[in-house]
């Protein structure tokens, strides 16, 4: 385990700040410039559309009556704490895993602030084909998905790297 924060994955916490600030600024821009459900087409397959998400990914539990706000708040805080502890235990040179953890933390905190401040998450990135729309999402959601994908990728790549070095004396 690293002896100080500069040698640990905590050195990567600037990514948390970057994701959080970008997410919050983009959502504030949407709240200041869009009415609910207002949409502006940017590309033939992409809109900015302001929607409110009272649930989780893909509006999971969005109409559950309000208790889900506190469940998702607890989950976001829990994951952020656990991943921060893991960051502290990781060497700073393990870039893929450190980047993954900080992306997830930044995204979780971005959506957490929305839930606490508004009671919902502001979503606005709307991809579609013809009349079929992918569920709207935001920068925080993107960071969480990329972070989760990197965690999965790291489990495969790290496993292969470990097998390559088995039996090799340094």
UniProtKB/Swiss-Prot annotation:
Keyword annotations of the record: Aspartyl protease, Cell inner membrane, Cell membrane, Hydrolase, Membrane, Protease, Transmembrane, Transmembrane helix
Record keyword Isomerase present: no
Pathway participation: Protein modification; lipoprotein biosynthesis (signal peptide cleavage)
One record GO biological process: proteolysis
Leading EC class: hydrolase
Record field: catalytic activity: Release of signal peptides from bacterial membrane prolipoproteins. Hydrolyzes -Xaa-Yaa-Zaa-|-(S,diacylglyceryl)Cys-, in which Xaa is hydrophobic (preferably Leu), and Yaa (Ala or Ser) and Zaa (Gly or Ala) have small, neutral side chains
Transmembrane domains' residue ranges: 12-32, 67-87, 94-116, 133-153
GO cellular component terms given for this protein: plasma membrane
Entry's localization field: Cell inner membrane
Superkingdom of this protein's organism: Bacteria
GO molecular function: aspartic-type endopeptidase activity
Membrane-related topology note: Multi-pass membrane protein
EC number(s) per entry: 3.4.23.36
Active site, per annotation: 123, 141
Presence of keyword Protease: yes
Pfam families xref list: Peptidase_A8
Function: This protein specifically catalyzes the removal of signal peptides from prolipoproteins.
Family: Belongs to the peptidase A8 family.
PANTHER family documented for this protein: LIPOPROTEIN SIGNAL PEPTIDASE (PTHR33695:SF1)
The name this protein goes by in its record: Lipoprotein signal peptidase
Originating organism: Shewanella halifaxensis (strain HAW-EB4)
Organism classification: Bacteria, Pseudomonadati, Pseudomonadota, Gammaproteobacteria, Alteromonadales
């Amino acid at each position: 385990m690293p002896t100080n924060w500069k040698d640990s994955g905590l050195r990567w916490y600037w990514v948390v700040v970057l994701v959080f600030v970008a997410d919050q600024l983009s959502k504030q821009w949407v709240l200041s410039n869009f009415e609910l459900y207002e949409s502006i087409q940017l590309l033939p397959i992409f809109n900015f559309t302001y929607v409110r998400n009272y649930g989780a990914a893909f509006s999971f539990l969005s109409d559950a009556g309000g208790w889900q706000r506190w469940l998702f708040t607890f989950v976001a805080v829990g994951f952020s704490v656990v991943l921060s502890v893991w960051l502290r235990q990781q060497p700073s040179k393990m870039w893929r895993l450190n980047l993954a953890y900080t992306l997830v933390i930044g995204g979780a905190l971005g959506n957490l602030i929305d839930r606490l401040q508004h009671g919902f998450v502001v979503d606005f990135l709307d991809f579609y084909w013809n009349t079929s729309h992918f569920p709207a999402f935001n920068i925080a959601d993107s960071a969480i998905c990329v972070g989760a994908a990197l965690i999965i990728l790291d489990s495969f790549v790290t496993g292969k790297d470990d097998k390559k070095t088995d039996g090799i004396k340094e």
